[in-house]
C-alpha cells in the first residue's frame, strides 16, 4: 500500500521552498530558474529512469522513479497544482480502457 501522505508531506515542503532563498535551497533555485529548468530536470530524470530500466537495474529504477516523481511534484507545485489533482485524474481513469480514455480526450 502506498503511503500517499508522504507525497503530501513532500508537496508541502516543496510549497514552502517557493518562498525560500534560491541560494539556500536546491528546489528554490529550480523555481527561480523557471519552467524550462524544471522541465529539463523532469526530462533528465525520465531519461535516467529509462536507462535504468533498459539496464534491468531494479534498484536504480526505484531511485530514478523517486527522482522523477520528486521533480514532477516540483513541476506541479510550480504551476499551483497538487498531488490531489493527479490522484483525482487517476480516479477518473480507473477502470477505463486506455484506448477509450485516449479517445475521450479533447483535442486543443
From Swiss-Prot:
Places the protein is found: Cytoplasm
Gene Ontology cellular component list: cytoplasm
Record-linked PANTHER family: HISTIDINE BIOSYNTHESIS BIFUNCTIONAL PROTEIN, HISTIDINE BIOSYNTHESIS BIFUNCTIONAL PROTEIN HISIE
EC code: 3.6.1.31
Signal peptide: none
CDD domains in the record: NTP-PPase_HisIE_like (cd11534)
Source organism (scientific name): Aromatoleum aromaticum (strain DSM 19018 / LMG 30748 / EbN1)
UniProt KW keywords: Amino-acid biosynthesis, ATP-binding, Cytoplasm, Histidine biosynthesis, Hydrolase, Nucleotide-binding
GO molecular function terms attached to this record: ATP binding; phosphoribosyl-ATP diphosphatase activity
Annotated family: Belongs to the PRA-PH family.
Principal location: cytoplasm
The protein's name in its UniProt record: Phosphoribosyl-ATP pyrophosphatase
Catalytic activity, as annotated: 1-(5-phospho-beta-D-ribosyl)-ATP + H2O = 1-(5-phospho-beta-D-ribosyl)-5'-AMP + diphosphate + H(+)
InterPro entries membership: HisE (IPR008179), PRib-ATP_PPHydrolase-like (IPR021130)
GO BP of this protein: L-histidine biosynthetic process
Presence of keyword Repeat: no
Superkingdom, taxonomy of origin: Bacteria
Presence of the UniProt keyword ATP-binding in the record: yes
Pathway annotation: Amino-acid biosynthesis; L-histidine biosynthesis; L-histidine from 5-phospho-alpha-D-ribose 1-diphosphate: step 2/9
